[in-house]
Amino acid sequence: MAFLIQSRQKFCVKNRLGLHATPAAMIVKIINKYKEIGVWVRHFDEQVNGKSIMGLMMLEAYCGTELLFIIEGGSIADQRTLIGELKELFEKKFFEE
């Protein structure tokens, strides 16, 4: 019997322009490196696929918005690496400032 490994991580949008097309594409590019991992992103009652640029943009995440990333599948090591890459991206404000 296989168990689905799930991690959850919150990130705060810190860049002035929020989650527009370029940051959304950066997130999707990172997530797509991990083929066996599924990612959902939640903001209040909205939940979208983390591999969808349009879905991420539909969250209307402005500066100061907190997003919950739900990461499923793959190995624990891959999930931790993915979280680390996303953390760096959010902390560096998507390299916009």
Model-inferred region functions:
Residues 5-9, 35-37, 63-67:
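A generic structural signal for short beta-strands and their flanking turns/coil linkers
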Residues 1-15:
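Catalytic strand-loop segment that frames the active site of acyl-thioester-processing enzymes
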Residues 2, 6, 22-25, 51-54, ...:
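Long, contiguous binding/interaction regions
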Residues 62-97:
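C-terminal structural segments of small proteins and small subunits
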Residues 12-54, 58-61:
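Compact, glycine-rich, soluble single-domain proteins
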Residues 1-3, 29-35, 96:
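A short, flexible low-complexity segment enriched in Lys/Arg and Gly/Pro that occurs
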